[in-house]
A protein has these predicted regions:
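The conserved acidic donor/metal-binding loop of glycosyltransferases
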Residues: 97-100
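Surface-exposed extracellular loop regions of Gram-negative outer-membrane beta-barrel proteins
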Residues: 263-265
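Glycine-rich hexapeptide-repeat left-handed beta-helix
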Residues: 272-376
Length: 376
């Protein structure tokens, strides 16, 4: 059997983390998300893998040795599958590129014309999959809150799905949705529904990305790469993953991921966070429940707040809408090549776009656009 991974999307809800990386290349404990997907597929005996690319495709093409198919329009999941129609000549497993799954898909592989579902505590974010006696009834785009089964973004199809993709009309969102194609297929021949067990994370929001890293941290425990220097008076509270060529000085690192070539300096504290490659947290910094992308440099005394003064849930602006993260503690999401001056304060839930500079003593209370220079 073969597999197709959809990795063409822009990952707009994950910005600024996807400013310069496709979401499938975002590192989870310093390894790209798509590597975990390919490893999971190969663990199930699936060696022939193709990837649909589009946005920031160069990174994927340089990293992977697989077949690539380009979705030039980037106009929905159905469009992405159709871009690889020449690859689809037999049964295949289809996997969304932003799904992190650590579990078994053996039953899905055994079940032709099927979709995987997972049980979650709140279906409202995902839409609910209704099925009876193992057969699909409907997929609710928006559902009420409460527990239920949701689309896991993993499928087992054959070339017949292409016939229904060709008939799929543009949705209200201006996209060609694979779920619409599946419902048409279901009216022709019943789609089977396969519940799967294991860790599942649809990495749609920046805090989902933190959660995926926290899951893998707990599995790994501790690791440090080659040529990394850890001072004897550094405090490392496991689980912690540190990359290669880092300098870990007199600091505290707790349940965090540090990429290659990073500096965590004197009297800095990094907790439940991801610091990507070649970033510096060098002096008297506080970083908690946050993500710092590659090539950043925090000025001395720069601190990221992770708790609202009123103890309410932290909200984040995603594509112009204020979204409740569902968590009391959440810091900031800092894009690539960001520099801050001394004593900068960054409020909870703030996003700072890539290539931005923040002047000394500034309090960053709202999102910063990419390429900005923020002054007092």
């Amino acid at each position: 059997m073969k597999a197709l991974i959809l990795a063409a999307g822009k990952g707009e809800r994950l910005q600024p983390l996807t400013d310069y990386k496709p979401k499938a290349m975002l590192p989870v404990c310093n390894k790209p998300l798509i590597d975990y997907q390919i490893e999971m597929l190969r663990k199930h005996g699936i060696d022939e893998v193709a990837v649909v690319i589009g946005h920031l495709e160069k990174a994927l093409k340089e990293h992977l040795n697989v077949k690539f198919y380009r979705d030039a329009s980037i106009s929905g999941t159905a469009s992405a599958v159709y871009a690889a129609k020449d690859f689809i000549d037999d049964e295949f497993i289809l996997l969304y590129g932003d799904v992190f799954f650590d579990g078994s898909i053996n039953e899905l592989i055994k079940t032709p014309n099927s979709m995987a579902v997972v049980q979650v505590g709140d279906v409202s974010r995902y839409g609910e999959v209704i099925f009876r006696d193992g057969k699909l009834v409907t997929i609710k785009e928006k559902s009420g809150s409460g527990s239920g089964f949701v689309n896991a973004g993993i499928y087992h199809f054959d070339p017949t799905i292409l016939d229904f993709i060709e008939k799929t009309e543009e949705s209200n969102r201006g996209e060609f949705e694979l779920t619409d194609s599946i419902m048409m297929l279901n009216r022709s021949e019943k789609v089977r529904v396969v519940p799967v067990n294991g860790y599942w994370n649809d990495i749609g929001y920046p805090w989902d990305y933190i959660d995926a890293n926290m899951y893998m941290l707990n599995k790994i425990g501790f690791s440090a790469g080659e040529n990394t220097e850890i001072w004897s008076n550094a405090t490392i509270r496991k689980p912690v993953v540190i990359g290669s060529d880092c300098k870990i000085k007199n600091c505290v690192i707790e349940k965090s991921v540090v990429g290659d070539g990073c500096v965590i300096g004197e009297f800095s504290i990094v907790k439940r966070s991801i610091v990507m490659n070649k970033s510096k947290v060098p002096h008297l910094n506080y970083v908690a429940d946050s993500v710092i992308a590659e090539g950043c440099n925090l000025g001395a005394g720069t601190k990221i707040a992770n708790l609202r003064f009123d103890d309410a849930n932290v909200k984040v602006t995603i594509k112009g809408k204020r979204i409740d993260s569902g968590r009391r503690k959440l810091g900031a999401f800092i894009g690539y090549n960001v520099k801050t001056g001394i004593n900068v304060s960054i409020y909870p839930g703030v996003k700072i776009g890539s290539d931005s500079w923040i002047e000394a003593e500034v309090s960053v209370k709202k999102d910063v656009e990419k390429g900005s220079f923020v002054r007092n």
